[in-house]
Amino acid sequence: FARRWRKKALKKYPEIDKIIKELNVNQDLAEKSSAPNIDQCAEPTAAMMKKLVVMLANNETEKAVLGEFGYFLGKWVYLMDAADDYHKDIKSHSFNPFVIELAHKNLTQKERSCYINGLLNETVSRITGAYNLMEIKSFKAILDNLVNMGLGQMQKKILFDKYEKDKNKKGAINP
């Protein structure tokens, strides 16, 4: 089923397939580097989102604004995924830039969540800055809600609420 849809998409948007293939190669290189850091690991997803979102631009100003928005949204998505998978990746010995970065720091779960939240907040501030420069014509109220409230609420849910729920269910977790 998905294969048929991919073929249709390839015919209509071949540049998107190229961008996604490039992401996969660059993501693999970033994660296999000798000393990967969080920004280096988030870069391929951020660059991919930038390229995809810029395709919607009608002029150079829109390209700049949408590029900034897409880049930092891609970075946020990568970081949120890594944050969400943190404990699972420790157990499965899977790659996770937060596990690598924080492995030798003796942090509590709350301290770790606050550190990651700070990185995400920096990223959200860049998303919001770019978003505020956009001329939104459709669905503005929905998009305002997503950018101004939804990103932060998702961070809270993943970084703090999930931990509290797990702690109350199984006892404290602090790998």
Annotate each PLM feature.
Residues 1-51, 55-68, 75, 79-109, ...:
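Acidic catalytic motifs of isoprenoid enzymes
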